[in-house]
């Protein structure tokens, strides 16, 4: 679909492949990943591109703001 994107969220616990709306906010991707991997609520998590591990995404922006493409690998890590 034109308004959806397939994303691979990679953590120390493995990789989760999921389809999101391009308008999905980063914090909602983090929340879904937290639930999928059963990560603790108190963990302060951030999302970034695999190629740019030091450029964390703003949690209030959407996937489309970062031009995330189908099949892209995003890293979920502790801040």
Locations of the language-model features?
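Ubiquitin system architectures
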Residues: 1-79
